[in-house]
């Protein structure tokens, strides 16, 4: 039972492999009507690029969750973008530079231009899927971060939002 009073069996079944082992019986019976997805996968954000392939997301799709295909497409695009040197700053957020194991200049976070592109594609994905993928509160925090990191006009985020969604953000000046 979770802290919120819900049954954890379903969540457990999502991260279970299709062949349950003996040790899982301690947790309890897995509902066979639930979709067992995969073990040994990431736990966390669906768009995490720390692993090359999101097996959990793929298995949801393989088991009939077709509505998740656009999320996989976006995530795979993010993985490709992350590997694109031009999309990344050569400095880390703390201003330092480093060399990787091959002796090449390492990469820091996405450039502001790359982040603008990512936001634009994410907002388009929201429209395509009907899922809320980013909240107004998160957008406001990003807007402030972008101002601190080089968007001195403080227009980039609100302009992208209006361009894609066709509506204004609550804090946007008219």
Predicted feature descriptions by range:
Residues 145-174:
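Extended, charged low-complexity segments
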Residues 1-141, 164, 171-174:
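Nucleotide-activated chemistry modules centered on ATP-dependent adenylation/adenylyltransferase
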